[in-house]
Amino acid sequence: APTREQAQRDFVTDRTPVVVATNAFGMGIDKSNVRFVIHHNMPESIESYYQEAGRAGRDGEPSRCTLLWNESDIVTRRRLLDMGGPNERLTADEQDLVRRSKRQLLDGMIGYCRTTECLHRYMTRYFGEHDTPGTGHCAGGCVNCASTFATMDVTPVARAISMCVHDLGQHFG
């Protein structure tokens, strides 16, 4: 814990410009000048992704959030959902309802990952803002609108990054 706390202090005070961490690291950090947030796999829901990506650019300066994912992330997320153990505080029907609700959240995230439409438009529709003036139009601010769309497998690069993190012991700031 002391190493984590020191890494957090160093990051917040700009002594450490980059931190590789789990999504739990960002909880409670109030740092406005984060420029990049990189997800090395697909989050469990758009709500989670939105909260995590929203850590970048809080000072209004240009920032980027990059999501690296592949189809195996979907398989893993679905398996984790299906393997969720019994909750003794919930009835079987309630557990099924929770599982279905989490599956719907995951399906929204899968749709976001797979869409070729404007990511801002997808996000605003997801949160219930349907084609209102000023919403969902990024004028080239998302990767889907900024370039011609081409699917590219970056699995080897993502694995190399993950292996580097693993080899460093996963605890450096």
Stretches found by the model and what they are:
Residues 1-25, 29-173:
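C-terminal helicase lobe
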